[in-house]
Amino acid sequence: MKNMIKSMLSFFVFLKFKNIWNIKDYLVKNNLDKGIVATVYDYYIHKEGGYVGITSKFANHPYMPHGFMGVFISDMSEIGKNAVIFQQVTIGADRLLDSNNQGNPKIGDNVYIGAGAKIIGNVKIGNNCRIGANAVVVNDVADNAVVAGKPG
């Protein structure tokens, strides 16, 4: 019964807002983290197997060819215009107390992030960058750069 109610609520919320990004924009604009719309947002994101923090910031809606499948974007992360984000990507905060890299990623415009890539901590990814599949990024990346592999 509970799932049926959530499904009905989701249907009506999506009728009003048209897509998940409009729901997120509404929640942020109105400083809401509770209520029916927030519940539907959380339900949809988790149902798709991902997480997009409500306080994460997007210059426009990113293109996700495989949907939210395994995508994790932490709260307070920032993503520029025309981002392409593939499945199983982590854009995550570093909150370890003894870390030199505490903070949230800031990603520039026109950035392509390949499947399984991990961007962790207080790093800045420049504009027009390509982050390869399964790359691990823990340092800043200059504009127009290509990153592949894992730090040594």
For each feature predicted by the language model, list its residue ranges.
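Terminal amphipathic alpha-helical/low-complexity segments used for targeting or macromolecular assembly
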Residues: 1-50, 152
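Left-handed beta-helix
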Residues: 54, 59-60, 65-66, 74-75, ...
